[in-house]
Amino acid sequence: MPKLTSASSDFSEKKKSKIKKNASISFETALNDLEQVVTRLESGNLSLEEALNEFERGIKLTKQTQKTLLEAEQHVKILLSDTPDAKLNPFTLDSE
């Protein structure tokens, strides 16, 4: 198995740092980033390690955007409900 170079390690560390930052980005930014990830993966120009890192980032962005959409859906349902004292509850995904 080939040994990882310091350049690939640097790439991994940069990606990990960027992934951590994704936790606080807006839905629109996350969706745009996800589209960029898909474009890079579909290009076929990434090394295996880069592709795996991008795939991992894409999964995290997908989970984040799905959670945001589900929270928005819950909010809309409550706003449209006939119950005047309905409250928003923290939303959790079953897979987390």
Curated annotation (Swiss-Prot):
Q: What is its EC number?
A: 3.1.11.6
Q: What is its main location?
A: cytoplasm
Keywords of this protein's UniProt record, alphabetized?
Cytoplasm, Exonuclease, Hydrolase, Nuclease
Name the top EC class: hydrolase
Cellular component annotations (GO), alphabetically ordered: cytosol; exodeoxyribonuclease VII complex
Q: What are the BP-aspect GO terms?
A: DNA catabolic process
Note whether Nuclease occurs among the keywords.
yes
Tell whether Nuclease is among the UniProt keywords. Answer: yes
Function statement: Bidirectionally degrades single-stranded DNA into large acid-insoluble oligonucleotides, which are then degraded further into small acid-soluble oligonucleotides.
Q: How does it assemble?
A: Heterooligomer composed of large and small subunits.
Record protein name field: Exodeoxyribonuclease 7 small subunit
